[in-house]
């Protein structure tokens, strides 16, 4: 039986000169040891976290030699560079950390793995993993249901699966964002949804058209809207708007102003009622501990 990573995805933000690497680890809940060691060892890594068995690394583009020391700094990412629309990632590690570098070979979305040094035992292992260059697109969706039927989170999840099935990219995340419970226009729980995708550059601007078509066909509401953000990290102003939308009623003009300031594309599907929730969802798409909370339970 072979033990391999399930997938490796690299999303590039050309404006920031950063890459977000998402790896699906072979173990059921991933490896917090890998997160800790990689971040401790690698000067290129700006942040790292784990969501289940998915490891996320935000890295600079460049090369930094690793000072590998058993137990203390055992494994990491030595180099990240882009060439011909491919992302090259060089991993290095001692003992098991080095063996892990080789296990990306059978992963989905990996084009090629070059073993630079064969690891195992107490030896250094080093491997170059090559993936297609991808980009992150976050979609906010709100107001697809009625008081009688439907659920926005379910429809959004179905759409995420359809995007992946269509081959436009990878469905990375589904975030339920709690909004202001006192909203008189809510159907019930007053939540909106953010979907995160890794997409191939040639499909970057086709994704919203595909999702718009599905929403048009499947939404039950007359006020459905979506919002689209291109980039790894929603801005501080987007986050603050989302937090405000948890606390109180906000005007649609404010949502449109935030969208204009952050190059967010607003797409009304059946109306404009869902615009506020769709834009707000984008601001907390990357803040999973804040997204589900009521305003009174958030300490900033």
Swiss-Prot record:
Which segments does the entry list as coiled coil? none
According to the record, the segments passing through the membrane are none
Task: Extract the signal peptide range.
Answer: none
Matching entries from Gene3D superfamilies are given as: 3.30.70.2200
Q: Name one Pfam family in it.
A: TiaS_TCKD
Which NCBIfam families does the record cross-reference, listed alphabetically? methan_mark_11
Official protein name in the record: Uncharacterized protein MJ0921
Organism of provenance:
Methanocaldococcus jannaschii (strain ATCC 43067 / DSM 2661 / JAL-1 / JCM 10045 / NBRC 100440)
């Amino acid at each position: 039986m072979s033990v391999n990573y399930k997938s490796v995805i690299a999303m590039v933000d050309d404006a920031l000169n950063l890459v977000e690497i998402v790896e699906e680890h072979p173990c059921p809940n991933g490896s917090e040891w890998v997160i800790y060691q990689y971040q401790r060892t690698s000067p290129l890594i700006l942040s790292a976290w784990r969501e289940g068995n998915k490891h996320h690394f935000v890295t600079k583009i460049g090369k930094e030699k690793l000072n590998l020391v058993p137990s203390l700094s055992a494994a990491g990412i030595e180099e990240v560079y882009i060439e011909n629309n491919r992302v090259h990632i060089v991993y290095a590690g001692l003992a098991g950390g080095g063996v892990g570098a080789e296990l990306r070979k059978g992963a989905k979305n990996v084009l090629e793995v070059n073993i630079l040094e064969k690891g195992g035992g107490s030896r250094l292992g080093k491997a170059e993993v090559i993936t297609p260059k991808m980009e992150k697109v976050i979609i906010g969706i709100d107001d697809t249901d009625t008081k009688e039927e439907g659920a926005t989170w379910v429809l959004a999840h179905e759409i995420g699966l359809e995007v992946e099935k269509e081959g436009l990219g990878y469905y990375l995340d589904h975030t339920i964002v709690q909004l202001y419970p006192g909203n008189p226009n809510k159907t019930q729980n007053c939540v909106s949804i953010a979907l995160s995708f890794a997409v191939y550059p040639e499909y970057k601007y086709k994704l919203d058209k595909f999702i718009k078509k599905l929403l048009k066909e499947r939404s039950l509401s007359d006020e459905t809207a979506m919002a689209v953000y291109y980039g790894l990290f929603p801005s501080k102003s987007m986050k603050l708007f989302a937090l405000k939308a948890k606390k109180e009623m906000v005007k649609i003009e404010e949502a449109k102003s935030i969208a204009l300031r952050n190059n967010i594309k607003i797409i009304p599907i059946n109306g404009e009622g869902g615009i506020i929730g769709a834009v707000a969802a984008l601001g907390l798409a990357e803040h999973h501990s804040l997204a589900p909370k009521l305003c009174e339970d958030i300490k900033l």
